[in-house]
Amino acid sequence: MDPLCTASSGPRKKRPRQVGASMASPPHDIKFQNLVLFILEKKMGTTRRNFLMELARRKGFRVENELSDSVTHIVAENNSGSEVLEWLQVQNIRASSQLELLDVSWLIESMGAGKPVEITGKHQLVVRTDYSATPNPGFQKTPPLAVKKISQYACQRKTTLNNYNHIFTDAFEILAENSEFKENEVSYVTFMRAASVLKSLPFTIISMKDTEGIPCLGDKVKCIIEEIIEDGESSEVKAVLNDERYQSFKLFTSVFGVGLKTSEKWFRMGFRSLSKIMSDKTLKFTKMQKAGFLYYEDLVSCVTRAEAEAVGVLVKEAVWAFLPDAFVTMTGGFRRGKKIGHDVDFLITSPGSAEDEEQLLPKVINLWEKKGLLLYYDLVESTFEKFKLPSRQVDTLDHFQKCFLILKLHHQRVDSSKSNQQEGKTWKAIRVDLVMCPYENRAFALLGWTGSRQFERDIRRYATHERKMMLDNHALYDKTKRVFLKAESEEEIFAHLGLDYIEPWERNA
């Protein structure tokens, strides 16, 4: 039996040829006459489908609004081959063996290349062996969705907070952190890429066979996975957790303002506890470190979403008091859907004058100081140059004006039932980062400050290695055409890169 044919219990009604848009003259020149595409709306949504249809037509592809006899390729997103066939069956349509069922990644790659790319296994949608009454031995069972479509780049994978492989990703994140403490960049990247790709899997790794074909899993990584499968833990991770240097660095860097160099210094001096450090009269602390110690208990505890939203109200009230047309967007982990975090980041931009933008953060700081809400601040002035090429580094910071603060958040702002008359401390110290960017750079800044860190590293790496472009928080530059590519939204940046758009909550790589 043809694997792309659905079982029919009775005579099939002849499908009428669709008319209307599919028969109308195309609005764009068709470059590839032998390909006729139909983009399935199921699980994709009308807006995204219309966007992809228009983009594909502009690239010279023939795309039908309705499914017709002339269609040669059905393109779907987040659907298996079986789901597409089930949809066709509901429509009373029998799929020909000549009809290609493809993942949207094929269309994205083709548009990026400016021509149809070769169809490989990673593009083809897989049909379950148990789909029809007569199983076809030519089709393999799962993990179809897993291995066949996984990219080495996090920007081509959807990674939600539903992590099915915590036992492995937790281990690799500990090893990555230890590598970072030792300033071993190669090991850090190896472990972070492994953790990132495992987070994106829609199934749990239960045997080494499940790792076949998954990128970013080298021999060392696979040895650790195998040990965890067999023993329930990794001896290397266990050794790291018991390592005095790791424990000390973990403790020291938990203090706001303390980095690797200071941690190394304190460790070499023999310090192993914060109490000994704070009581040592010979040590000198920066203004940031003093604030870090002073509000340590608050800052080391997690910020809840309710607290983050309450801070958001504070920020918007202050910003809009001076710049009513400003856009204030919460970024970072909270924009990606996380329920807790260590700080709250906000991106601020305005279509108004540059002079108003430059003066905003000092005015906001002054306002909070007068209200008694400002516990600490560090204002970093902008060094942004409009026509400077994006950085070649995948981990570089941007040059926008920014302010790192610690704000006093009263409990009553989070929970109105809590009275100001309550005993004890009535507020919590919260770390807040404010970033002010020019209006025309807002899309790039939003993409960069949303994260995750691994997602941003990979989308910049992808731009460089796959598209011959340079991307950072400021701009996107096409090295081939030698032009800056403008973007009004994150969606447009993805489109420039030939990437399928990934929502913020799917960037938890």
From Swiss-Prot:
Mg(2+) binds at residues 343, 345, 433. Residues 1-25 are annotated as: Disordered. Can also utilize other divalent cations, such as Mn(2+) and Co(2+) (in vitro). Transmembrane segments: none annotated. The keyword Nucleotidyltransferase applies. One of its GO terms (molecular function) is DNA binding. A motif (Nuclear localization signal) lies at residues 11-17. Residues 258-262 are annotated as: Involved in DNA binding. InterPro entries: BRCT_dom, BRCT_dom_sf, DNA-dir_DNA_pol_X, DNA_pol-X_BS, DNA_pol_b-like_N, DNA_pol_lambd_fingers_domain, DNA_pol_lamdba_lyase_dom_sf, DNA_Pol_thumb_sf. One of its GO terms (cellular component) is nucleoplasm. Its EC number is 2.7.7.31. Residues 27-124 form the BRCT domain. It catalyses: DNA(n) + a 2'-deoxyribonucleoside 5'-triphosphate = DNA(n+1) + diphosphate. A 2'-deoxyribonucleoside 5'-triphosphate binds at residues 333-338, 342-345, 448-449. Keywords: Magnesium, Metal-binding, Nucleotidyltransferase, Nucleus, Terminal addition, Transferase. Pfam families: BRCT, DNA_pol_B_thumb, DNA_pol_lambd_f, HHH_8, NTP_transf_2. Its main location: nucleus. Belongs to the DNA polymerase type-X family. Interacts with PRP19 and DNTTIP1. Forms a ternary complex with DNTTIP2 and core histone. Released from this complex by PCNA. Interacts with TRERF1. Template-independent DNA polymerase which catalyzes the random addition of deoxynucleoside 5'-triphosphate to the 3'-end of a DNA initiator. One of the in vivo functions of this enzyme is the addition of nucleotides at the junction (N region) of rearranged Ig heavy chain and T-cell receptor gene segments during the maturation of B- and T-cells. This is DNA nucleotidylexotransferase. It comes from Bos taurus (Bovine). The gene is DNTT.
